[in-house]
Amino acid sequence: MKKATQSKAWTTVQIARHPERPQFLDYVGEIFTEFDALHGDRLFGDDGAMVGGLARFDGQPVMVIGQHRGRSTREKLKHNFGMCNPEGYRKSQRLLDMAERFNLPVFTFIDTMGAYPGVGAEERGQAEAIATSLAQLSSLKVPVIATVLGEGGSGGALGIGVADRVIMLSHSIYSVISPEGCASILWKTAEKAAQASEALGLTADKLQSLGIVEYVVDEGEGAHLDPERVMQNLKVVLKQALDELLPMDANERCEARYQRLMKFGSENLGMAS
């Protein structure tokens, strides 16, 4: 039984990384209309890994922000393989400010191995940029809905992952570290990545059982096999989540978001909330 569970977790990792898996801009084109991308952080530059802008969702103006990886070599380089630099997170902060100013609900979409670990990124304040994003999202007065599309890797994912509702596709993953990285630390070899994937509890079902994720969107054997159906399934869940949040008072919504974060781990660790 244990081996079967490990195999299932590792299979999920492989599907989440499938090269034909739909990416952020694919979902934007199917779920939203009138998308108008905005560029730059007004401090250093524009980060192709973080894409965001104004759009309409069922006719309603919204702000859409997400990580895009790219498929061709040229596109992957343009989008830095979905690994954001500090200017990417600062661009998202600028868009979040705009969303709050104009009372626009925010949809974020996560698909990254992690934040870019380069020297330049560290020199420009990668940790500060992510921390500021976490603080900003925690207190934003408008509804925030986050969706994990593929890989949700560590702080790179959390930088746009604090939300009122979190959604995962059924073959997406969300983890503090990659299975290979975990295996290299614990067992000094990446060959035990399958075992690490089970230990990390990175699957959508597991995270939903822990209360970290509210919704899991069924994608059958993988979103790459029937992308249009999966996108429509996700659109239905996004609408449901937004309909739950819009009637709430802004202060009530912020307090509920705070309490959602504070309860993580309390039940499983036997701690008081």
UniProtKB/Swiss-Prot annotation:
Gene Ontology BP annotations: fatty acid biosynthetic process; malonyl-CoA biosynthetic process
Principal subcellular localisation of the protein: cytoplasm
Gene Ontology CC terms, in alphabetical order: acetyl-CoA carboxylase complex
InterPro entries given in the database record: Acetyl_CoA_COase_a_su (IPR001095), ClpP/crotonase-like_dom_sf (IPR029045), COA_CT_C (IPR011763)
Subcellular location: Cytoplasm
Residue intervals of the CoA carboxyltransferase C-terminal domain: 1-244
Record protein name field: Acetyl-coenzyme A carboxylase carboxyl transferase subunit alpha
Organism: Acinetobacter baumannii (strain ATCC 17978 / DSM 105126 / CIP 53.77 / LMG 1025 / NCDC KC755 / 5377)
Lineage, top ranks: Bacteria, Pseudomonadati, Pseudomonadota, Gammaproteobacteria, Moraxellales
